[in-house]
């Protein structure tokens, strides 16, 4: 495909135009008085959202240079969303301000590389001040306040705080669509996986259609169990102990399954068989997790263990097991706390090292099942459009709350950046174009507060000047229009969100300023179709 090439100022200005179009569409959503954006979908109802990354993803520009500029800023929003779960609009607004100021200085003759170095040093200094000023989240109310701001709904904030309180910061909080109105919170004790009983004959509670085993042994087998002779030895040993048995295997086939069912129906031996969760290597890992949690071992020929020779000390134990048609829950496994902690550390290391979003999500689920718990927030709404929007807001707020617990909180409303900047620039000693680069950051960190003020119908310059003169931690509460102590008023941001927004915006701004050439695909003109669409090329069949 033919290419078109732009050089120097033309290249940078083309990229900036794309950035500005995208940023202008996103920044109207910033702050408590931000507006919504309607996104048309090829199929189904349109989506209404105030989430920066969702809006950014939908924007495709026609001009090739503008398109590249917009794609670069999408990366800012996407990266911030991945790391912190929020702050995508703030990151976009900061990127726009940094690029605007930076390009003005490049056009005036400043050295782009020195500007970039100055920006990086200033951002590092501001980040250091942000982290130093962060306050640890100590109460449920502080988590609720943070989540409420992200979701723009106090009820959602309170529910997320309750969920986090129950499952801990390592726990998984999932959001599901509900057919009812309102919000519901469902908590899961212990480890749950998505496989139920193989046969309904295992049910012990006919009304609830579930099998409940108290203080059972747990047999974990990596292969299929097809021959009843392989099982007889271990079954006899378990029966002698008068305990029940949960069998987790790739499958339990006809003969072996029939033996278990007959013993259960006759009341001789209570057991339940379920298929192992997952597939391939992921199944192996999950079985190993269950073994560590319950203090058992996976019976597998790979490690030289066979079902035929299995002994009771290879079995896991738990206080209780509940099995339904679709899922199995193991409550209070009898595993060694030290071994569980080691497994948790291993999974954490894998999360750090993986590049795949899907793998990361699955690893986090495994981590939660071992270290925390699982909470499900069920959201309902009157229409499908509203439901999608609400679900998305809750998902963002969950990640926002987790970020707050992780690194602490700072005053919200764009104030933390300005006040961290005041301290950071007092100590920063730079010269020449590096000092100019630092000054670009000094100007740009006002941008989020200015945009919040504009969206609230206030004069941005006046608001920024007023906030600069206020005590540390005080600022504009844009929801009420009052200048007050923001942390006390529950207006806060996770420092991870604010920090990530600034760092990612600066990273992209540096790329913009040091770009000298842009190579893009040449737009193809739409060639009109040839007249006469029949098989004889317009000859009417003759």
From Swiss-Prot:
GO biological process terms on file: protein refolding
A GO CC term attached to the entry: cytoplasm
SUPFAM superfamilies, sorted: GroEL apical domain-like, GroEL equatorial domain-like, GroEL-intermediate domain like
Top-rank lineage group of the source organism: Bacteria
Entry's localization field: Cytoplasm
InterPro entries per UniProt: Chaperonin_Cpn60_CS (IPR018370), Cpn60/GroEL (IPR001844), Cpn60/GroEL/TCP-1 (IPR002423), GroEL-like_apical_dom_sf (IPR027409), GROEL-like_equatorial_sf (IPR027413), TCP-1-like_intermed_sf (IPR027410)
The EC number(s) this enzyme carries: 5.6.1.7
Annotated binding of ATP, by residue: 29-32, 86-90, 413, 477-479, 493
Record Gene3D superfamilies: GroEL, GroEL-like equatorial domain, TCP-1-like chaperonin intermediate domain
Keywords of the record: ATP-binding, Chaperone, Cytoplasm, Isomerase, Nucleotide-binding
Subunit structure: Forms a cylinder of 14 subunits composed of two heptameric rings stacked back-to-back. Interacts with the co-chaperonin GroES.
Job description of the protein: Together with its co-chaperonin GroES, plays an essential role in assisting protein folding. The GroEL-GroES system forms a nano-cage that allows encapsulation of the non-native substrate proteins and provides a physical environment optimized to promote and accelerate protein folding.
Family to which this protein belongs: Belongs to the chaperonin (HSP60) family.
Protein name: Chaperonin GroEL 1
Organism: Renibacterium salmoninarum (strain ATCC 33209 / DSM 20767 / JCM 11484 / NBRC 15589 / NCIMB 2235)
Taxonomic path: Bacteria, Bacillati, Actinomycetota, Actinomycetes, Micrococcales
Gene expressing this chain: groEL1
């Amino acid at each position: 495909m033919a290419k078109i090439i732009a050089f120097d100022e033309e290249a940078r200005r083309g990229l900036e135009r794309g950035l500005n179009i995208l940023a202008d569409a996103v920044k109207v959503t910033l702050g408590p008085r931000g507006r919504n954006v309607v996104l048309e979908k090829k199929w189904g109802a349109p989506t209404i959202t105030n989430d920066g990354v969702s809006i950014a993803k939908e924007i495709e520009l026609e001009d090739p240079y503008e398109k590249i500029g917009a794609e670069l800023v999408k990366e800012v929003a996407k990266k911030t969303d991945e790391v912190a779960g929020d702050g995508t609009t703030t990151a976009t607004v900061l990127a726009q301000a940094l690029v605007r100021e930076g390009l003005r200085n490049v056009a005036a003759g400043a050295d782009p590389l020195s500007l970039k170095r100055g920006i990086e040093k200033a951002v590092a200094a501001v980040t250091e001040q942000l982290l130093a000023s962060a306050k640890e989240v100590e109460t449920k109310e502080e988590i609720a306040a943070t989540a409420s701001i992200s979701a723009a709904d106090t009820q959602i904030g309170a529910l997320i705080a309750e969920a986090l309180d129950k499952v801990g910061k390592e726990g998984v909080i999932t959001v599901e669509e509900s057919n009812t109105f309102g919000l519901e919170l469902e908590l899961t004790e212990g480890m749950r996986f998505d496989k139920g009983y193989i046969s309904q004959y295992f049910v012990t509670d006919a009304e609830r259609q579930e099998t409940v085993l108290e203080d059972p042994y747990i047999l974990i087998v990596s292969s299929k169990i097809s021959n009843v002779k392989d099982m007889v030895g271990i079954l006899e040993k378990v029966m002698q102990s008068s305990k029940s048995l949960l069998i987790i295997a790739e499958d339990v086939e006809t003969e072996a399954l029939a033996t278990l069912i007959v013993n259960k129906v006759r009341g001789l031996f209570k057991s339940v068989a379920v298929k192992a969760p997952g597939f391939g290597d992921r199944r192996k890992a999950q079985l190993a997790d269950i073994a560590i949690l319950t203090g058992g071992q996976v019976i597998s020929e790979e490690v030289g263990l066979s079902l035929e020779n299995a002994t009771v000390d290879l079995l896991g134990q738990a206080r209780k097991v509940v099995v339904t048609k679709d899922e199995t829950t193991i409550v209070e496994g009898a595993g060694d706390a030290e071994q569980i902690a080691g497994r948790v550390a291993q999974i954490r290391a894998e999360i750090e090292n993986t590049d795949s979003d899907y793998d990361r999500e699955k690893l986090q689920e495994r981590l939660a099942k071992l270290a925390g718990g699982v909470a499900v927030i069920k959201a309902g709404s009157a229409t499908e459009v509203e439901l999608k929007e609400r679900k998305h807001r809750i998902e963002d707020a969950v990640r926002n709350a987790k970020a707050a617990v992780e690194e602490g909180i700072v005053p919200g409303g764009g104030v933390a950046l300005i006040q961290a900047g005041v301290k950071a620039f007092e100590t920063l000693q730079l010269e020449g174009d590096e000092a100019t680069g630092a000054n670009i950051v000094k100007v740009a960190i006002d941008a989020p507060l200015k945009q919040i003020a504009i969206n609230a119908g206030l004069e941005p310059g006046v608001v920024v000047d007023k906030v600069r003169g206020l005590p540390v931690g005080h600022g504009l509460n844009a929801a009420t229009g009052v200048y007050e102590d923001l942390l006390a008023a529950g207006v806060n941001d996770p420092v991870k969100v604010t920090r990530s927004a600034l760092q990612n915006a600066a990273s992209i701004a540096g790329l913009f300023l040091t770009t000298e050439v842009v190579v893009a695909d040449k737009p193809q003109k739409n060639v009109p179709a040839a007249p006469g669409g029949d098989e004889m090329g317009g000859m009417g069949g003759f």
